[in-house]
Amino acid sequence: MARTGIRIKGPRAASEELHEAIIVGGSYAGLSAGLQLARARRRILIVDAGLRRNRFVSQAHGFLAQDGRSPDEILHDARKQLLEYGTVTFLRATATEAAGSMNDFRITTDRGDSHRGMRLLLATGLKDELPAIPGLDERWGTTVFQCPYCHGYELNRGRIAVIATGASAYHHAAMVADWGEVALFTNGAVDLDDEQERHLKDRGVVIERERVLRVSGATTIELRDGRSEPFAGIFTAARTSLASDLASLVGCELEDGHFGQHIKADRFGQTSVSGVFACGDGTGMAGSIAVAVSSGATAAVGLHRSLVFA
């Protein structure tokens, strides 16, 4: 197959080409969806801003045959393979506007380009919003994490801190206890009942109610009473928000999840708007590459069927 490469358009260019699908978001879910649609010989445009959610992470884990690889390398290889299909165009840009209806959607980018598509697939992801504790942001993805399946094993059963952000901290701490010796810092964010406390203690979790002042060094937690506690790693459940407002712009219904709003979609990615599909973290899926890839592939099947049976 002839490789298409990355299409470069001049400023304020407008394309009247009608793509069969426009995918907004070229990370794991978006590229996975693109691959399925390319293999169905559909003409697709992928628009990606290059701000994947796990861009702070140096190694990816839990993804079959890719365990321990750099997320950048995984994406590079995926994009290279996808662009071997002659019906695929990739555009490095941020989609800023979206409008339209079934068979005639239009997106506009920050470059001034506009593009038309019969279907729209949103793989725009989420933004993480960490607790306002000094030292957390700059360590996010290196020594501060959310997913123990992605990062717990490498802590070698060392001491692990879980900083509460809400009621989910009980479940978070109980789960993380399989990866090391856990201290749960309630930080005024969660009230544990007697049964929860008993369960956590049975799991070997130490409950610490003193407020967290800051994180220093690699993974040292400094408390308001002056104590400092070193850890192998820190877990916390970030609040999330949609990384793009395109879903709202085209009228998609949103719903509340455990950590923030996400796009409401059925198991094949169909949103509340006919012809608009969604996949990946932005639909409330667990934040892992493996789950994102699965979500993208499944949404692509739903989108493809809608083209066939419209």
Annotate each PLM feature.
Residues 76, 82-109, 114-117, 180-261, ...:
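A Rossmann-like FAD-binding core segment of flavoenzymes
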Residues 4-8, 129-167, 171-174:
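Glycine-rich dinucleotide-binding loop and its adjacent helix/turn
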Residues 19-73, 158-159, 164-190:
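Beta1-alpha1 glycine-rich phosphate/pyrophosphate-binding loop at the start
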Residues 42-43, 49-51, 58-85, 146-147, ...:
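N-terminal glycine-rich dinucleotide-binding loop that anchors FAD/FMN and/or NAD(P) in oxidoreductases
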Residues 34-35, 170-172, 279-310:
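A conserved FAD-binding loop/helix module that cradles the flavin
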Residues 132, 138-154, 240-290, 298:
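FAD-site-proximal beta/loop scaffold in flavoenzymes
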Residues 1-19, 76, 85:
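Extreme N-terminal leader/targeting segments of oxidoreductases
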